[in-house]
Amino acid sequence: MQINKKEIKQNLKKWNEEKKSIKSFSFTGDIILDNVSYTYSKKTPFEFRALDNADLTISDKKITCVIGTTGSGKSTMIQLTNGLLISETGQTIVGDYKIPAGLKKIKEVKDLRREVGLVFQFPEYQLFQDTIEKDIAFGPIHLGADKEEVYKKIPELLDLVSLPREYAKRSPFELSGGQKRRTAIAGIIAMDGKTLVLDEPTGGLDPKGEEDFMNLFLRLNKNQGKRIIMVTHNMDQVLKVADEVIVMHEGKVISKGSPFEIFSNQELLSKIQIEPPKLYKLMYKLKEKGTDLLNKNIRTIDEFAKAFKEVRKGK
């Protein structure tokens, strides 16, 4: 039998292209990290294993907060979700995208990053265009969106992040720090993905700015069904917005639950050296004095006051 070298080359090329594809067509909506590991500066004196056979499922259409001390693997984990990093072991599944360990190149990387928008800490430092509208439009246009359609949406995006519409033609470098951050986040929202991933989104903001951003993320989740994944050291923010909390420690996921379950677990918080929200500090002290409110699923000071009165009446 004669060997057709041309046909073999074509088949090999096709096989290699298919190997790089991450489309699995098994959409569940969840983000799954299955036994993933990642090491920085391998085979150097600075080698650091950031993720160590970590397993994790992040539900669709929820606000999930990721907590843990510096170096616990939080930022590395979120970079796996949109292909900025690729794990050394296991696999990362994002809806109907499956990213196996060791993959050299992601064929559908633009599609993946359109679906999962990643906002780094201090995103305002990434602004570079000469007007706000150009900065907002850059990401979605770069990923293949229609330019005209993107620009049509800019007034609504400015409304969404509480910036005046007339700011569209301004230079982003004329804005305050908080306004620059709103512009950067508007650019990620403009890609219209299902998931918004945020790394310390309120770092460096004043209390009013923090509250504004938390309310924005709540609106995106409740009104548009966006999945929000937020890395933060601010436990008061976690208590306010989270549906689920993921606890990371030394490259592993060691706990997952509602904010009430996590913050009621004093032993867990002590182990990972995380300070609880102010309300829970108060409830810990009350428990020591005989008044236990830790099972009341309290988020706000008003809910605390109501529960405290009810418990005191019962006594």
From Swiss-Prot:
This is Energy-coupling factor transporter ATP-binding protein EcfA2. ATP binds at G68, T69, T70, G71, S72, G73, K74, S75. It is an enzyme of class 7 (translocase). ATP-binding (A) component of a common energy-coupling factor (ECF) ABC-transporter complex. Unlike classic ABC transporters this ECF transporter provides the energy necessary to transport a number of different substrates. The keyword Membrane applies. InterPro entries: AAA+_ATPase, ABC_transporter-like_ATP-bd, ABC_transpr_CbiO/EcfA_su, ECF_ABC_transporter_ATP-bd, EcfA2, P-loop_NTPase. GO terms for cellular component: ATP-binding cassette (ABC) transporter complex. Belongs to the ABC transporter superfamily. Energy-coupling factor EcfA family. PANTHER family: ENERGY-COUPLING FACTOR TRANSPORTER ATP-BINDING PROTEIN ECFA2, HEAVY METAL TRANSPORTER. Its EC number is 7.-.-.-. It holds the Pfam family ABC_tran. GO terms for molecular function: ATP binding; ATP hydrolysis activity; ATPase-coupled transmembrane transporter activity.
